[in-house]
Amino acid sequence: MKMTRTLRIWGGFLLLLLLLFVFLIWNIFAGSVSLSASEIWRILLGSDAGFTQSQIIMKIRLPRLLSALILGGALSLSGYLLQTFFHNPIAGPFVLGISSGAKMTVCVAMLALLSRGKTTSSAILIAAAFVGAMVSMDFVLLISQRVKRMSLLVVCGVMIGYICSALTDFLVTFADDSSIVNLHNWSLGSFSGMSWDNVKTMAVVCGITLLLAFLLSKPIRAYQLGEVYAQNMGVPLRAFRTALILLSSVLSACVTAFAGPISFVGIAVPHLMKSLFKSAEPLCMIPACFLGGGVFCLFCDLIARTAFAPTEVSISSVTAVFGAPIVIYMMIHRKAA
């Protein structure tokens, strides 16, 4: 039995790594400008290649696919941590209004800076998104203390998201034309326009958060078995819950700051990983969710770029098309069980 479980886990990770390799290669080749395998290989090795071709690979496609990988993993891991915290299978940064709160404060920061002719830095956007995520999370926590049914908590989270979105739209109404264009493109959700500085920043933020999540794997497992059990195992519940909130908020804030609000990844991918690995062990699920989220977003970004080329679809629309049916199936299957 243990051998079968081990083989399943290794098989699951091998499948994810294979899919990751396939989508990385596919994303490098996909685009309006066709490049041969030999050209791409020379560019990656730093050999002599055309300036235009080199710029396309090194300045556009590589930063974009790495951003999709990192931010997709961050969003999926954030959803897993929130589902653990609330003991709710459909908890996620988008559903609970956390992404919308981050979107609102990033909008405020962008408007304030752009109206003064200043550029927006990664640090400012992440800080603004984190503040918005924490404000929304505080409202959700306040409601969770008064509402016993998790279905009502989700509805309240959706309402918080609508309020934040309405306030964001209100702010955009009074913005100047140039700011509206920037905000509109960002608010639709996209991995385009990423720079290597953006990639480095998100890699550091998400990498540290991923490491901290690994350090919490034992307390998470104890918490999954019940709060009483966790207390008996010596888990400081208040500090542990605070850590989960902070980690999930940092992850969702980082995603929103760079790529805008992206839906359903944080809900759908953790359930896909649980079904694939047949395990709820945090030591397995934390890397699986991060890797699975990256693969899922690479696939969705590929569809967004190529399905209606040269027109690009917002990444959030594509993740909703593929993620929503997974959530619906999961809820029906859970109800039947």
Regions found by a protein language model. Name each.
Residues 1-337:
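Alpha-helical transmembrane segments in inner-membrane proteins
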